[in-house]
Regions:
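N-terminal ligand-binding/catalytic initiation module
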Residues: 1-85, 325, 331-337, 341
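Buried hydrophobic packing segments
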Residues: 2, 94-102, 126, 248-252, ...
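General beta-strand structural signal in soluble alpha/beta enzymes
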Residues: 54-60, 79-81, 139-142, 193-194, ...
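Glycine-rich phosphate/diphosphate-binding loop of Rossmann-like nucleotide-binding domains
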Residues: 85-186
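Short glycine/serine/threonine-rich phosphate/pyrophosphate-binding segments
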Residues: 122-126, 200-203, 222-224, 245-247
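Rossmann-like adenosine-cofactor binding region
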Residues: 145-238
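Adenosine-phosphate binding glycine-rich loop
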Residues: 212-367
């Protein structure tokens, strides 16, 4: 299910890549080795796959840019140049998805109550973005427990405690009771953000969920049966490959010589427009959002898998794009070509290249 989620993410972005998932299940202390030794050994195990262009490791749960540097060193393909922190990019798409869902529901973030599972790099960044927009963080859980406050938790306090105590921050937040981690799901909130393990929403707890909207950080956060129940309960469930695609979006954009600010621009413009358009279209068709967007994305995957269509299915889509965009389309294509040859170009050329990238990827879903 995790590899499938990655496949859907690439297809949603309209990038011709398949999906895979791998990880290291080990405790360095028990093996009497350093974390860096494990990372490099993992990289050496991937060496032939990386050399053949079959598999490219990336960041996910419990990993950092430093980990990725070590893995790629072990794989014989050391990363060159400044990389984009994929965890921050993931936070951007999760936040923007939530913002568009709230907007589509004719609400304001300033009166939205939020529950967040986990408080790692992505979840804490999402909490900061939400709080900065006025949302009220009612509850936060880690593996050590859940804390909540009807008046809202102070995110800056949570961030300070996270830096000092990690997951045990819940035991150090003042004047709150620590309950079981799973009690987060039954909180009276508008927005629930599952942010840790797969299938945390299941047949045992789905009936207790009070949220109106679920926007996940985690991959595969709900079982298929639980997703069906959420539909029946009238709860809007946003698939993982939509909400948390920021990490691989940043990876793809870094390959085309864009930076984090470019990722932010694309998320706040084309990505935001796409999420809102998909919400509209699914309602017009009378279909659940998750089923509609899965069908559209799978069609993208099939088109991208067809070698006759090129990257990314543009031979079929390019004439209409040219017709729709006229001179702007010509300018953006020229800018993109110049940018590829000279990534340090800026100003109009850089913006044209970014517009072209948007057209080739997320923008083609809107058209």
């Amino acid at each position: 299910s995790l590899a499938m989620a990655m496949t859907y993410k690439w297809a949603f972005l309209n990038v011709p890549m398949g999906g895979a998932k791998a990880g290291i299940f080990a405790v360095p202390e028990e093996l009497k080795c350093e974390r860096s030794d494990l990372r490099e050994a993992f990289g050496r195990g991937l060496k032939s796959l990386v050399a053949q262009g079959v598999y490219f490791p990336g960041l996910d749960l419990g990993t950092t840019l430093e980990d990725l540097y070590s893995i790629m060193e072990g794989a014989g393909r050391p990363l060159v140049g400044e990389q984009i922190d994929g965890s921050h990019a993931t936070a951007l798409t999760v936040f923007e998805t939530a913002r568009q869902v709230v907007k589509y529901s004719h609400r304001e973030l300033s009166d939205v109550r939020v529950g967040i599972e986990g408080f790692g790099k992505v979840a804490s960044a999402v909490a900061e973005l939400l709080a900065g927009s006025g949302a009220i963080i009612i509850g936060v859980s880690t593996i050590d427990g859940m804390i909540s406050s009807e008046n809202g938790l102070d995110v800056q306090t949570l961030l300070s405690l996270k830096n000092e105590f990690g997951d045990r921050l819940v035991h150090h937040y003042p004047a709150v009771e620590v309950t079981a981690p799973e009690s987060l799901y039954s909180l009276d909130v508008d927005l629930l953000i599952p942010g840790a393990r797969p299938r945390v929403i299941n047949e045992k707890n789905v009936s207790s969920i009070e949220a109106k909207w679920i926007v996940p950080i985690a991959n595969a956060p709900a079982t298929w049966e639980a997703e069906k129940s959420l539909d029946e309960m009238g709860i809007l469930f946003i698939p993982d490959f939509v909400a948390n695609c920021g990490g691989i979006l940043s990876s793809a954009m870094r390959s085309d010589y864009f930076d984090l600010e470019d990722v932010r621009y694309l998320v706040e413009t084309t990505f935001a427009e796409l999420v809102f358009a998909l919400l509209q279209e699914s309602e017009l068709r009378g279909e659940s959002f998750k089923e509609f967007v899965r069908a559209v994305t799978w069609q993208n995957h099939l088109m991208l898998s067809d070698p006759s269509t090129g990257f990314p299915g543009m031979r079929k889509r390019l004439p209409q794009l040219i017709k729709d965009r006229d001179w702007h389309g010509v300018k953006s294509r020229i800018g993109y070509r110049i940018h590829r040859r000279n990534p340090k170009s800026n100003g109009v050329i850089h913006q044209s290249a970014l517009d072209r990238y948007a057209e080739l990827t997320l923008g083609s879903m809107i058209n």
